[in-house]
C-alpha cells in the first residue's frame, strides 16, 4: 500500500528533486503540496511548485503558505538557488492556480478528511507546520509523523551552528519541536553526505525529460558543483520514507535556540542525554551514501 504524504516545500533546486521523488516513487502517494517562504519569497516558491506540477502533469492540489516567519524578518537562499529559486530552466506557461485558502488550513482540512493519519514532510522553514499545530491543535491525532529536512547536531550552513530551514524561522521550529508529535529530523549530518557524483550528473540529460530539466537547474545550484558533486539536502526526507534502512537514527532531546546572539536557529541535539530530558526527535546521524545514490538513480529513472 502506498504511503499517503503531504509535502510542505520552498522550491528551490534541491526541492525540485525531492518533489520528483515524492511524485514518482511507487511507494508514496503525494496528496497535497504547500509552499512557504524560504529559499525565495512565497510568491516565487508557489510559482516554482506550480511549474513543476505542470511539467509532470501532476494533478496534486497546492496551497500557498506563509510569506514571513512567525516573528522575525525573512531571509532567503537566493545565493544558492538563484533569484527565481529555480534558475537555469525555462518552464512553459500554464494557468494553474493555488487553492484559495492558506496552507495550514489546507493541511488541516485534508488531515480531517483523510481515512487514516498522514505523514507530513517539511523541506523548508517550519512556519506552516507551526501555524497548523498552534492554530489547529485538534489535528495532532491525525498526523502520523513529521519528517523534516532541517537542523544539525553539529555545524550549520548559514551560521556556524544553524541550518538554513531552522534559522529562517527559529520560533516556528521551536513550536514544532515542543509539540509532542513524532518527528524524524534529516539534518546536515546526513544531507551533507547526500551527494550526487559528477559521473551520475553527466548522465542526466540522456535519462528522460526530467533528467534534462534537473541537469539545467543543477548548473545553477550552489550547494557543491557539477565538477565535485551536488548535495541533495531536501531529498533525504523523501529517501527516509522509502528507504529508512539507509539512515542511522538516534532518539534525542532537541530544542531550538531562539535567543542567542550568535546561536539563534541552532538545533541543540542532546546526543549523550546530558540534559536528562526525554527524547522528542529521531535524529538522522549517518547515511549509507552508496545506497542513497542507487535509490536516487532508480527513482529518477521512473520520472517522465
Curated annotation (Swiss-Prot):
Q: Carries keyword Hydrolase? A: yes
Q: What Gene3D superfamilies does this protein map onto?
A: Ribonucleoside hydrolase-like (3.90.245.10)
* Enzyme class at the top of the EC tree: hydrolase
Q: Which GO terms describe its molecular function?
A: purine nucleosidase activity; uridine nucleosidase activity
Does Amino-acid biosynthesis show up as a keyword for this record?
A: no
Q: What is its EC number?
A: 3.2.-.-
Keywords, sorted A to Z: Glycosidase, Hydrolase
* Biological process according to GO: purine nucleobase metabolic process; purine nucleoside catabolic process; pyrimidine nucleobase metabolic process
Got a GO cellular component term for this one?
Answer: cytosol
CDD domains registered for this protein in UniProt: nuc_hydro_IU_UC_XIUA (cd02651)
Role summary: Hydrolyzes both purine and pyrimidine ribonucleosides with a broad-substrate specificity.
Provide the family line: Belongs to the IUNH family. RihC subfamily.
State the name under which the record lists this protein. Non-specific ribonucleoside hydrolase RihC
Amino acid at each position: 500500500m502506498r504511503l499517503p504524504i503531504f509535502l510542505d516545500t520552498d522550491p528551490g533546486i534541491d526541492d525540485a528533486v525531492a518533489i520528483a521523488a515524492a511524485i514518482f516513487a511507487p511507494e508514496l502517494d503525494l496528496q497535497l503540496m504547500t509552499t512557504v517562504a524560504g529559499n525565495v519569497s512565497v510568491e516565487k516558491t508557489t510559482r516554482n511548485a506550480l511549474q513543476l506540477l505542470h511539467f509532470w502533469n501532476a494533478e496534486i492540489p497546492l496551497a500557498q503558505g506563509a510569506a514571513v516567519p512567525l516573528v522575525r524578518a525573512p531571509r532567503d537562499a537566493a545565493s544558492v538557488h538563484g533569484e527565481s529559486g529555480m534558475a537555469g530552466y525555462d518552464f512553459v506557461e500554464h494557468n494553474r492556480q493555488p487553492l484559495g485558502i492558506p496552507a495550514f488550513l489546507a493541511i488541516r482540512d485534508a488531515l480531517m478528511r483523510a481515512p487514516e493519519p498522514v505523514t507530513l514532510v517539511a523541506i523548508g522553514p517550519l512556519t506552516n507546520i507551526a501555524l497548523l499545530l498552534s492554530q489547529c491543535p485538534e489535528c495532532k491525532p491525525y498526523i502520523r509523523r513529521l519528517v523534516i529536512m532541517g537542523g544539525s547536531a553539529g555545524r550549520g550552513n548559514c551560521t556556524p551552528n544553524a541550518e538554513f530551514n531552522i534559522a529562517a524561522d527559529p520560533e516556528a521550529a521551536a513550536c514544532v519541536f515542543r509539540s509532542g508529535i513524532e518527528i524524524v529530523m534529516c539534518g546536515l549530518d546526513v544531507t551533507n553526505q547526500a551527494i550526487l557524483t559528477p559521473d551520475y550528473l553527466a548522465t542526466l540529460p540522456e535519462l528522460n525529460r526530467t533528467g534534462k530539466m534537473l541537469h539545467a537547474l543543477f548548473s545553477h545550484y550552489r550547494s557543491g558543483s557539477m565538477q565535485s558533486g551536488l548535495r541533495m539536502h531536501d531529498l533525504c526526507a523523501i529517501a527516509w520514507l522509502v528507504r529508512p534502512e539507509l539512515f542511522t537514527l538516534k532518539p534525542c532531546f532537541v530544542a531550538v535556540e531562539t535567543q542567542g546572539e550568535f546561536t539563534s536557529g541552532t538545533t541543540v541535539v542532546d546526543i549523550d542525554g546530558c540534559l536528562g530530558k526525554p527524547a522528542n526527535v529521531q535524529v538522522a546521524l549517518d547515511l549509507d551514501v552508496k545506497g542513497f545514490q542507487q535509490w536516487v538513480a532508480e527513482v529518477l529513472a521512473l520520472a517522465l
